[in-house]
Amino acid sequence: MTKNIENSSEKGRNALYIASFCLALLVFAAAAFLAAKGKPTGWEYSWFRSINGWSEGWYHFFTVVTFFGSTLGALLSVIVVFATRAYRLAWRLALTIIGAYGIALVAKHVIGRARPVELLTGVHARAVETGMGFPSGHATVSTVIAFTLWPYLPKKLRYAIVPLFIGLVCLSRLYLGVHFPLDVVGGIAVGIGAVSFIRILPQAFRKRIRIS
């Protein structure tokens, strides 16, 4: 009886991860199609101008926030998890970050969308970034970190912590003038897709590579 319940629960989780992966793929495809056109228009242009135009009083706050989506921030998150002796979780987090970031880098070259300072005038460029803009690597990394750690966060707080964490990192990229809204949407989609894909892998395979 207990085994049947466990199997049913596992199937339910797999169905959720498959649905999440498919949705992430669709969102990414739609965002990539629009981003490939280059300059932002409509709502994307308005949102970028509005957030990028916030006062300089936000600078130090968002400079700290954006760190958590950086390469160093990713490394720090893995080290912290490893320090808690959750070795398999740390390994899974590291592999997912590497895989997702690799996908984001490939997508940047394929889509070829330039940064805001190259496409618009009057951008408040508060940070310097090189390379293409879509999708956002910071949005990708922060999403992977948040959703990989989701099951280990307090149940009453995870629904607030995860969206807040990802949302603030994404806002920081717009405020600093290094990404457009569709860039961070694409990054979130890559992150969710990567986390979901890892969980969809057969249990035996996950155990073999020591991520489960």
Where are the predicted features?
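N-terminal transmembrane-helix/juxtamembrane module of multi-pass inner/ER membrane proteins
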Residues: 1-73, 108-127
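Membrane-embedded catalytic cores of phosphoryl/pyrophosphoryl-handling enzymes
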Residues: 3, 7, 120-212
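Interfacial segments of alpha-helical transmembrane regions
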Residues: 14-24, 77-103
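Aromatic-anchored segments of alpha-helical transmembrane domains
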Residues: 27-32, 98-106, 165-178
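Short helix-capping/hinge motifs at transmembrane helix termini and TM-loop junctions
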Residues: 35-39, 84-85, 111-115, 154, ...
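Membrane-helix interface segments
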Residues: 57-58, 86-90, 154-160
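Hydrophobic, aromatic-rich transmembrane alpha-helices
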Residues: 74-85, 142, 146-150
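Hydrophobic alpha-helical transmembrane segments of integral membrane proteins
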Residues: 94-120, 179-193
